[in-house]
Amino acid sequence: MMKTNYENIAMLLQNGTSVKIYADNFSVSNIRLLAQTAVKHGAVLHLVVNPDYILADNLKLISQDGRKNIFVEFV
């Protein structure tokens, strides 16, 4: 199994591929950049989030980047 990293996800999004990631593996700033990349290239970024890990305010900022392109799932 390939280790998930920011560069791999960004490359997939730049190619218009929709991806589902576990937000715990990324910094908030990287998630924000991935969200912006998804919007720019018409891909969908599905974030699986542990509510104890990331603040709701950060999720609001991230989701403002593109409501149709960003999905947040709490686990």
Question: Language model features by range: what are they?
Answer:
Residues 1-75:
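General marker for long, soluble alpha-helical cores
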